[in-house]
Amino acid sequence: MMIPARHMPSMIGRNGAAYGSSSALSLSQPNLLDNHQFQQAFQHQQQQHHLLDQIPATTAESGDNMIRSRASDPLGGDEFESKSGSENVDGVSVDDQDPNQRPRKKRYHRHTQHQIQEMEAFFKECPHPDDKQRKELSRELGLEPLQVKFWFQNKRTQMKNQHERHENSQLRSDNEKLRAENMRYKEALSSASCPNCGGPAALGEMSFDEHHLRIENARLREEIDRISAIAAKYVGKPMVPFPVLSNPMAAAASRAPLDLPVAPYGVPGDMFGGGGAGELLRGVQSEVDKPMIVELAVAAMEELVRMAQLDEPLWSVAPPLDATAAAMETLSEEEYARMFPRGLGPKQYGLRSEASRDSAVVIMTHANLVEILMDANQYAAVFSNIVSRAITLEVLSTGVAGNYNGALQVMSVEFQVPSPLVPTRESYFVRYCKQNADGTWAVVDVSLDSLRPSPVLKCRRRPSGCLIQEMPNGYSKVTWVEHVEVDDRSVHNIYKLLVNSGLAFGARRWVGTLDRQCERLASVMASNIPTSDIGVITSSEGRKSMLKLAERMVVSFCGGVTASVAHQWTTLSGSGAEDVRVMTRKSVDDPGRPPGIVLNAATSFWLPVPPKRVFDFLRDESSRSEWDILSNGGIVQEMAHIANGRDQGNCVSLLRVNSSNSNQSNMLILQESCTDASGSYVIYAPVDVVAMNVVLNGGDPDYVALLPSGFAILPDGPAHDGGDGDGGVGVGSGGSLLTVAFQILVDSVPTAKLSLGSVATVNSLIACTVERIKAAVSGESNPQ
C-alpha cells in the first residue's frame, strides 16, 4: 500500500539518524524497500514518534550538523533532498544556548508534489541555476534558497549516478559480446578441418582464411580499445577486457594466431609457429624494460669489442679444416669467466657452450655491412643458408646522425643448417649497433631471456656479433664472434661432430658466407665484363635480373631443406623411409611458383669423399647425366653464365638439356653453384624458355615460376692438417655430409587430394638419385 507523502511523518530518531527516506530517495534507489519492508518500517517509526511526543520540544536534537554533512556529501544527498527546514527555528545562535539544556527538535517538511514537479521542470531546462534563479524559484515555491540549492545539487548527483550505471551496463554487455565472439574464433581455429578429407587441417592450409581472420582480428582489437577507453573514463584506470595470449606455438598453436608479421620474400610468419614463435608475443614494454635492455646492450657491446680484439689466452688456435684453410679460433671458458664475471650469469643447466671467432677482408663498405645487419629482410636474404627467419619485433632506437650509430632493436631469429637432421635454433635478443671512438663499427646481439624468460630455453646468445674496420678502396675487415649456449641433444649422430666443432653455426660459416655474398653483390654492379668469353652475359640489366632470380631460387631451396617452421611446409607422417622427410604445401596466387600441390623431399647422408670433390662432380654439366634422372640421358650444355667471385665454382649458369628423344622438347635449367670455407651448394630449377628470354633482356624475374632442387655439401667435421683421413666417420675423416632435396609439382590443382602414389614416386626419385651419386663419387674416389 502506498502512503501519501503528506501523511508520512519524519523518520529521524533520537540520534539524528534517518530511518526512512523521502520521495527523492526513489530517484536514486527505487528498489531499496519492498512493500512489506516499508510497512514494518512505518509501524516501527510510529512507535518511535509516540515516545518522542512525550519529550519536550527543547530536548530534540538539532539537525544542523546533519544538514551540512548531507549537503557536502554527494552520496548522502539523496536522503536530505526531500527534507526541508530551517537550521535554527527559534533564531537563537548555538553559542547562546544553554549547554545543559537539550536542543529543540528539528522540524522537517516534505517538498510537496507541486514543488518537486516545478523544480524538475526547471532542472530539465537549466540543471545549474544561479543565485538569482534559485531565489526566484524559492520565492515561487515557498522554499528557502538553500533548500533549492541542495535539491538541485542532489538531483545532479542522482542523474550522474544513473548515467554511470547505464554506461557500465552497456560496457558489460559489449564486453560479453566481444568475449563470446572471440571464443567463437578460437574454437573455429582449433576445430578447423580439411574440406577434402575431413581430417584436421594442415598448418599450411590455414593460410586460405588467414586474410579474413586478420581483418576480423583487427576489428575486434579496435572495438576492445574503444570500450577500454570508455571504461577508463569512468573507472579511472585502463581496463584489459581479455587476457593476452602469451604462448605461441609452444602448445602447437601458440604464436599470436592472427596478427603476425611477414617474413622476407612474402613468407608469412607461421600462424602456429614453432618452439620460439612465442617471441612474437614477447614485445618489449618500453617504459619498463627499455632501461634494462639498454644497460644489457651496452655491457654486451663492451664485451664483444674486447673479445674481438683480445688474443691468447682468451682465444686458442684450433686445427685448420684442410691445408689451405685458415686456423680456427676457440674460446677458453676459464679465461672468459675470469675476464667477464658479469654478463648473462652462469651457464644454464643442460646447455652446451659454443664459441668461435673468425675474420676476413670483404669487398663492401662498412656502411653497407651495417645496413645489411640492421635490416631484417636484407639480413635474412644475405645469410639465407644460415637464417631461416628474421623478424624485428620492436625498434627501441633508430640511431643518430642519419646512420645506425646507437640503433637498438629487439629481434627474433631462427638459425639453420641445410639438413633435416639438424634442428633449427631460435633466439630472442636485442641487436645494438655502435660506432666506436677509433672509428670502427660494432653490431652485437645478446639474449633477452633474463627479461622475458622462455619455458623451454634451447638457444641463448651471449654477446655475439662483429667488429667492422673500414679499409681502403671500399673494403672492410670483419671480425666475427659467435658465443652461444645450446641444447643440441636432438642433432643426428652424423652431424654431431660438425655441430660440436662450431663449424655448423660458428663464426667461420658466418664470415665465409658474408665474404661470398659480398663478391656476389659486387659482380652485380660490375661494369667491365670481358666480352671475349663465350656464354658470358654482358648486359647489365640481364645480369641483375638473372642474379635476382637465382637468389630467389636459393632462398626457396634453403627454406625447404631444414626443419624450420617458417616456410609453411607441412611434414607428412608415415611418408616412407625414416631418413627421408617429405613435406607438402599448396601454391595459390604465387607468381613465383607454379600453382598446385608441391612435394618437398629431403634427406642427408655421409659420403667418404672430400666436400670439394663432391661439389665439383655435382656442378659439372658434363657429369649431370650420371645422377639426374630428369635429364633422361640427354646432353647438357651451358648456354650462359655469370661469375660470382674469385672461385670459379661461384657462378650462375643457364643450362640446356638436349633430349635424346626427338619427340621431347629441350629443357632449360637455371643453376647456381657456390662454395666457401664452411660448405658448398648446387641448386637448380627447370625454367620456361620464354620466361628466361624476358629475364635475359632485363625483365622482372619475380614472375618466373620455379621449383628449386639441389644439394648442400658440408664437411663431416674438422679435419687434421693436410689430409683426407682414413675414410671413416670421425675427427679428421675428411668426408662429406650431403643433403639432397627435391621440390616437385605433383598436381596442378591446389584443391586436389594428395595421392600416396605421388609420395611414393618422390621417395623413389630421391632414393635413386642418392644411389647414383654414391656410386659415381665412390668410383671417382678410387685410385686410378
UniProtKB/Swiss-Prot annotation:
Leader peptide range in chain numbering: none
Entries under SUPFAM superfamilies matching the protein: Bet v1-like (SSF55961), Homeodomain-like (SSF46689)
Coiled-coil spans in chain: 158-234
Biased composition (Basic residues): 102-113
PROSITE patterns for the chain: HOMEOBOX_1 (PS00027), HOMEOBOX_2 (PS50071), START (PS50848)
Portion annotated as DNA-binding: 104-163
Main subcellular localisation: nucleus
General function of this protein: Probable transcription factor.
The family this protein is said to belong to: Belongs to the HD-ZIP homeobox family. Class IV subfamily.
Protein name, entry field: Homeobox-leucine zipper protein ROC2
Organism encoding this protein: Oryza sativa subsp. japonica (Rice)
Gene: ROC2
